[in-house]
Regions:
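Short acidic, S/G/P-rich loop/turn micro-motifs used as interaction or catalytic elements
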Residues: 67-72, 101-104
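Acidic-basic catalytic patches of nuclease active cores, encompassing PD-(D/E)XK
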Residues: 1-41
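Short, flexible loop/turn motifs enriched in small residues
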Residues: 45-49
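Short, charged, amphipathic alpha-helix that recurs within catalytic cores of restriction-modification
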Residues: 70-91, 95
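Hydrophobic beta-strand segments of well-ordered beta-sheets in folded domains
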Residues: 60-62, 90-98, 117
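Surface-exposed cleft-lining segments at the edges of enzyme active sites
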Residues: 6-8, 64-69
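Conserved catalytic cores of phosphodiester-cleaving nucleases, focusing on short active-site segments
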Residues: 52-67, 77
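Domain-level recognition of nuclease-like catalytic cores that cleave nucleotide substrates
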Residues: 96-130
Length: 130
């Protein structure tokens, strides 16, 4: 039961952060039916997953938001970005927006992966879209 409660708490925190993101940016969450997809080399329909999309200076921008930074999560999002840029052949930007890049008083180290155009906290993203 403790594990389930912990997962529910993380899910609730993530949903709350998505709501805050929408409130402060005015960008609404994407619906699954509107997300791009392609047929991969194995003949399987593959969805390119992200949370939000907007345009900045005429460029389509895809955003994934999360409460904490983890390198494995960035790897997943970098893969999505590469698929969007290479398989769907779309000129676009991909950003990962984190609630805070400081955890337990220490700044998180971010190594940007191929496909990603930026990993930043919400305040830096707000400055980007101004």
């Amino acid at each position: 039961m403790e594990h389930q409660s912990s997962n529910q708490s993380r899910s609730r925190n993530g949903n709350d952060f998505e709501k805050v993101f929408t409130e402060v940016t005015g960008i609404t969450k994407m619906k699954k039916k509107d997300k791009p997809s392609f047929i991969n080399s194995h003949g399987i329909h593959q969805l390119i997953d992200f949370d939000f999309t907007t345009e900045i200076n005429g460029t389509k921008v895809y955003i994934d938001v999360t409460t904490t930074y983890r390198s494995d999560r960035q790897k997943q999002k970098a893969y999505n970005a590469l698929m969007m840029k290479n398989k769907v052949n779309m000129d676009c930007k991909f950003y990962m927006v984190i609630k805070s890049l400081v955890e337990n008083g220490k700044p998180k180290t971010v190594n940007l992966l191929e496909g990603m155009d930026g990993v930043m906290d919400i305040n830096d993203f707000i400055n980007l879209i101004k």
